[in-house]
């Protein structure tokens, strides 16, 4: 992209504005997570899952409204594959009885349908707790491995900058899931596919950040007399074309998945869309500026020690 071929944008000079912007997003995310929380899927709170054929025509919304009074709780209803629907119910009890009520209700309310249960699954509370714990450990473990990897490849300030950026990305994405749940026409429940999306976001954001860090390290050896802030700004600008092209093409694919992938993948693709946008932003305005602040503080301490 020629518009970024000789880019010389003052990203570093505007980092304080970026701090304010990120701070507002993080504050909103924390407030929403504390007050509204997250809507957990049956993977993490237990329940039943049914894949039903021959009942797609009425639509997910109509089926959900018909089943809610019968089941005593609002089920999650999504289109599944080419012809089936997926029904998830956060309920305990006899799965055969719940299945019977679902099938009978659909037949009575929508006579034109011929519902047949293709597959059933049940997630017990203990197994759901194990899955929840495993999801938390997987994200924290990924962050720890990333910290050690960058520590070995660069230095601890770069490691901290990368991990801060990743926490920033995951927290804001989680906050949006909490804030927007119930306001969007698709489910934003946290299940195993969403955890996979978060791990993908972590990897994608890290990739952008490492590219910038690698260029910073290269330019630190070439421009030894330049102030570190100028080196960082030059590094961000020279990798900007690659960052925008990679993010733009990936985002295009994920948007297509969001539009045409069906309701089952809508929450997953929404998480990726948010993560790619926030991750691209953080690789420019969060990760590298954190390194600048840490090095500036270290230099200030050295000057203070020398003055004494």
Swiss-Prot record:
User: Gene3D superfamilies from the xrefs?
Assistant: Multidrug efflux transporter AcrB transmembrane domain
Subcellular location per the Swiss-Prot or TrEMBL entry: Cell inner membrane
A single GO cellular-component term on record: plasma membrane
Which biological process annotations from GO are given for this protein? intracellular protein transmembrane transport; protein targeting; protein transport by the Sec complex
Query: Taxonomically, which superkingdom?
Result: Bacteria
Instruction: Report how it sits in the membrane.
Output: Multi-pass membrane protein
Return the SUPFAM superfamilies for the record. Answer: Multidrug efflux transporter AcrB transmembrane domain
Q: Name one GO molecular function term.
A: protein-transporting ATPase activity
Membrane-spanning ranges:
18-38, 134-154, 160-180, 193-213, 244-264, 272-292
Keywords tagged on the record: Cell inner membrane, Cell membrane, Membrane, Protein transport, Translocation, Transmembrane, Transmembrane helix, Transport
Q: What is annotated about its quaternary structure and interactions?
A: Forms a complex with SecD. Part of the essential Sec protein translocation apparatus which comprises SecA, SecYEG and auxiliary proteins SecDF. Other proteins may also be involved.
- HAMAP family linked to this entry: SecF_B
Any idea what job this protein has?
Part of the Sec protein translocase complex. Interacts with the SecYEG preprotein conducting channel. SecDF uses the proton motive force (PMF) to complete protein translocation after the ATP-dependent function of SecA.
Describe the family membership recorded for this protein in Swiss-Prot or TrEMBL: Belongs to the SecD/SecF family. SecF subfamily.
Its protein name is Protein translocase subunit SecF
Q: Which organism is it from?
A: Rhodothermus marinus (strain ATCC 43812 / DSM 4252 / R-10) (Rhodothermus obamensis)
